[in-house]
Amino acid sequence: MEPIRILQVVPNMNSGGLENLIMNIYRNIDRSKVQFDFLVHYQKKGFFDDEIVKLGGKIYRFSVREDNNVIKYIKELNEFFKEHPEYKVVHGHMASLGFIYFNIAKKHKVPVRIAHSHGTSHLKTLKGYMKFLTLKLE
Protein backbone atom coordinates (compact mmCIF):
# COMPACT_ATOMS: atom_id res chain seq x y z
CA MET A 1 0.00 0.00 0.00
CA GLU A 2 1.27 3.46 -0.91
CA PRO A 3 1.92 5.89 1.95
CA ILE A 4 -0.43 8.81 2.57
CA ARG A 5 1.25 11.90 1.13
CA ILE A 6 0.86 15.09 3.18
CA LEU A 7 1.63 18.36 1.45
CA GLN A 8 3.50 20.70 3.81
CA VAL A 9 3.07 24.32 2.68
CA VAL A 10 6.01 26.40 3.93
CA PRO A 11 7.98 29.51 2.94
CA ASN A 12 11.16 27.43 2.38
CA MET A 13 13.04 24.63 4.10
CA ASN A 14 15.93 26.52 5.65
CA SER A 15 17.09 25.84 9.21
CA GLY A 16 14.58 27.87 11.22
CA GLY A 17 12.32 26.78 14.07
CA LEU A 18 9.35 25.77 11.92
CA GLU A 19 11.55 23.83 9.52
CA ASN A 20 13.37 22.02 12.34
CA LEU A 21 10.05 21.04 13.91
CA ILE A 22 8.77 19.58 10.64
CA MET A 23 12.05 17.76 9.98
CA ASN A 24 12.15 16.27 13.49
CA ILE A 25 8.68 14.85 12.90
CA TYR A 26 9.54 13.73 9.36
CA ARG A 27 12.67 11.86 10.45
CA ASN A 28 10.73 9.95 13.11
CA ILE A 29 7.46 9.00 11.39
CA ASP A 30 6.89 5.66 9.68
CA ARG A 31 7.54 6.82 6.12
CA SER A 32 6.16 3.57 4.73
CA LYS A 33 2.76 4.83 5.96
CA VAL A 34 3.09 8.63 5.76
CA GLN A 35 5.25 10.75 3.46
CA PHE A 36 5.75 14.50 3.54
CA ASP A 37 6.02 16.54 0.36
CA PHE A 38 6.75 20.26 0.39
CA LEU A 39 5.32 23.22 -1.47
CA VAL A 40 7.89 25.98 -0.97
CA HIS A 41 7.60 29.62 -1.98
CA TYR A 42 11.14 30.39 -3.16
CA GLN A 43 13.10 28.98 -6.09
CA LYS A 44 16.38 28.86 -4.16
CA LYS A 45 17.37 25.51 -2.69
CA GLY A 46 16.74 25.22 1.05
CA PHE A 47 18.96 23.86 3.82
CA PHE A 48 16.91 20.65 4.25
CA ASP A 49 16.11 19.97 0.57
CA ASP A 50 18.68 17.20 0.06
CA GLU A 51 17.56 15.41 3.23
CA ILE A 52 13.90 15.69 2.21
CA VAL A 53 14.61 14.01 -1.12
CA LYS A 54 16.74 11.35 0.61
CA LEU A 55 13.81 10.59 2.96
CA GLY A 56 11.48 10.17 -0.03
CA GLY A 57 9.84 13.60 -0.11
CA LYS A 58 9.11 15.75 -3.13
CA ILE A 59 9.66 19.52 -3.32
CA TYR A 60 7.49 21.79 -5.46
CA ARG A 61 8.76 25.34 -5.95
CA PHE A 62 6.60 28.42 -6.39
CA SER A 63 8.02 31.94 -6.61
CA VAL A 64 5.25 34.16 -5.22
CA ARG A 65 7.44 35.36 -2.33
CA GLU A 66 10.05 36.50 -4.86
CA ASP A 67 7.93 37.98 -7.63
CA ASN A 68 4.83 38.97 -5.57
CA ASN A 69 2.61 37.91 -8.49
CA VAL A 70 -0.51 36.67 -6.70
CA ILE A 71 -2.48 36.12 -9.94
CA LYS A 72 0.29 33.83 -11.23
CA TYR A 73 0.34 32.06 -7.83
CA ILE A 74 -3.40 31.38 -7.99
CA LYS A 75 -3.06 29.94 -11.51
CA GLU A 76 -0.07 27.82 -10.47
CA LEU A 77 -1.91 26.46 -7.43
CA ASN A 78 -4.98 25.56 -9.50
CA GLU A 79 -2.78 23.71 -11.98
CA PHE A 80 -0.86 22.03 -9.17
CA PHE A 81 -3.94 20.62 -7.43
CA LYS A 82 -5.43 19.59 -10.79
CA GLU A 83 -2.24 17.66 -11.59
CA HIS A 84 -1.84 16.22 -8.06
CA PRO A 85 -5.14 14.72 -6.87
CA GLU A 86 -3.13 12.36 -4.64
CA TYR A 87 -3.00 14.97 -1.88
CA LYS A 88 -5.76 14.36 0.64
CA VAL A 89 -4.05 16.43 3.36
CA VAL A 90 -2.62 19.95 3.11
CA HIS A 91 -0.78 21.16 6.21
CA GLY A 92 -0.24 24.90 5.92
CA HIS A 93 2.35 26.79 7.92
CA MET A 94 1.95 30.17 6.18
CA ALA A 95 -0.82 32.33 7.57
CA SER A 96 -0.05 35.12 5.12
CA LEU A 97 -1.02 33.08 2.03
CA GLY A 98 -3.26 30.53 3.72
CA PHE A 99 -6.49 32.11 2.57
CA ILE A 100 -5.33 31.50 -1.01
CA TYR A 101 -3.90 27.98 -0.87
CA PHE A 102 -6.56 26.61 1.49
CA ASN A 103 -9.41 27.91 -0.67
CA ILE A 104 -7.84 26.46 -3.80
CA ALA A 105 -7.20 23.12 -2.04
CA LYS A 106 -10.85 23.10 -0.96
CA LYS A 107 -11.96 23.89 -4.53
CA HIS A 108 -9.97 20.84 -5.69
CA LYS A 109 -11.64 18.68 -3.03
CA VAL A 110 -8.69 18.19 -0.68
CA PRO A 111 -10.64 16.84 2.31
CA VAL A 112 -8.20 17.66 5.14
CA ARG A 113 -6.73 21.16 5.42
CA ILE A 114 -4.73 21.94 8.55
CA ALA A 115 -3.78 25.52 9.44
CA HIS A 116 -0.83 25.60 11.82
CA SER A 117 0.21 28.83 13.46
CA HIS A 118 3.74 28.94 14.79
CA GLY A 119 3.52 32.33 16.46
CA THR A 120 1.19 34.50 18.48
CA SER A 121 2.32 37.98 17.48
CA HIS A 122 -0.94 38.48 15.56
CA LEU A 123 -2.81 38.27 18.90
CA LYS A 124 -1.22 41.51 20.15
CA THR A 125 -3.64 43.75 18.25
CA LEU A 126 -7.43 43.84 18.27
CA LYS A 127 -7.50 43.38 14.49
CA GLY A 128 -5.18 40.36 14.73
CA TYR A 129 -7.19 38.81 17.54
CA MET A 130 -10.46 39.29 15.63
CA LYS A 131 -8.91 37.63 12.57
CA PHE A 132 -7.79 34.74 14.79
CA LEU A 133 -11.30 34.32 16.18
CA THR A 134 -12.82 34.45 12.70
CA LEU A 135 -10.49 31.69 11.48
CA LYS A 136 -11.37 29.54 14.51
CA LEU A 137 -15.09 29.82 13.68
CA GLU A 138 -14.81 28.69 10.05
Regions found by a protein language model. Name each.
Residues 1-138:
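Membrane-interface segments of envelope glycosyltransferases acting on lipid-linked substrates or membrane lipids
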